[in-house]
Amino acid sequence: ATKWKTRIIWEYYKSTYLKYKKLNNKSNGYLIKLTLVATLGGLLFGYDTGVISGTVGSLESFFVDPKGLAEYESSRLTGFIVSSALIGCIIGGAIGGLIGKMFGRKNSLIIAGVLFFISALGSSMPEMFITTIGQGDHTLSNVFIFYRIIGGIGVGIASMMSPVYIAEIAPANKRGKLVSYNQLAIVGGFMVVYFVNYFIALSGDDSWLNEFGWRYMFASELIPVTIFLILLYTVPDTPRSLVYHDNEEKALEVLKKVNDEKEAVEILNDIKDTLKEKTAPLFTYGFGIVVIGVLLSVFQQFVGINVVLYYAPEIFKTLDLATDTALLQTILVGIVNFLFTIIAIKTVDIYGRKPLMIIGAI
């Protein structure tokens, strides 16, 4: 009798374990899919921001030089053309939260994707809707700037909504690590576009690059953007967003796919409770932390990282390097950025957030 009892207990625990393992593998696969789709928004953030680096000289040759401006005015216009997307980033960052609340996290990412698409198409062909494709000239510099600002708005929205989507879809015990992959995707986007710019530059000489090559660099973004938009239609909105928009049934369905049934119900109830609470006291309690977080982002810009990300090829050209060689050197910048982001992700749970931020500040 004891032998049979032992066997029954063993079989019970064995079947329970196998059931849990099967459920866990299934939920992990689904969670990885959702995370990968969301991080494509981060990749496009890096791609759209970094693509300009390979086109600075060409944009100056195409849009600025024919205007016959004085050196100071010429440099100022070139700088504005290159950095114009940042205007859109400010707008996108300011309205991203409101859009996410009104339309949901998924739809916000779709909006960002559409803006990326419009920007990539318009930046590569600013004469579109104005004259024959390929017949544009320096008079369209303002149109080009407009399309870059559109892309910047997409960057601002994606920079906010991609990590929010991941954070709201992931279980608490995996949230921190999965959200960090969005940063990896951003620097990955920079690295990928540096490679793309380099190989496009190899397709012709500087004359071809200044006339047509820069167009292909901007147009290349259409490929990842299209993939992003298609994949977004295969994923759901986040449970929190679904509850906010009175779709609790769908929210529970999503939660069950990444958690066991009992935990899914508990999380759903927690979401409903938190949405009923006022956020003002919570913000007041953590105001200092929020300020520090914002200042970290501000100081990151103050160290001049964007100068390197935007102008690396031009900096290397001052060393009398050819355009393709300068773009090849820029790839190394992207690789170093990517590798150290991986190191940060792998060590953050060992050393903690604060020590790594101190090391980065030093």
Question: Residues of each region from the PLM?
Answer:
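Alpha-helical transmembrane bundle of multi-pass membrane proteins
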Residues: 11-249, 256, 273-362
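Short phosphate-engaging motifs
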Residues: 250-251, 263
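Short intracellular "coupling" helices and adjacent cytoplasmic loop segments at the cytosolic face
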Residues: 257-266
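TPR/TPR-like alpha-solenoid helical repeat scaffolds
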Residues: 265-275
